[in-house]
């Protein structure tokens, strides 16, 4: 688990708490969330307000706050949420997707285990699952859930790494030229 001060240092961004937040109320983060519909343990969650062609994650902050989330990565000033989220913490970054990828890259750097990256146009999930079935009896493996192979899915998969793992199997797919380098 990371605390928000550590994450602020990793992302080189300001950590801002609203008027009712204090240092001893900083959440300990074990879950990264990009889809508000997938909230499980609010008190351990850091929500990344991604801005995509399909929508703006910032609009879900008040709802997530009401459901118990207190830690957010935003690309807009947190001032607009001051009244609706009085006990929230905000990490303000230029680009929330880049911040997600940067945090996952830092987390990966803490582990010295083999990582198998499975790429290609077709068959990534089948190959990953086949390798998992083949090696699972002799290794403690972390793997991408389902088809988490996108610019968002890969960092969420990498975040699952724990000291007990001795092998990682991650899918990586791209939609645009240049995306593989970011993964």
Cite the ranges covered by each PLM segment.
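N-terminal leader/targeting and accessory segments in enzymes
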Residues: 1-102
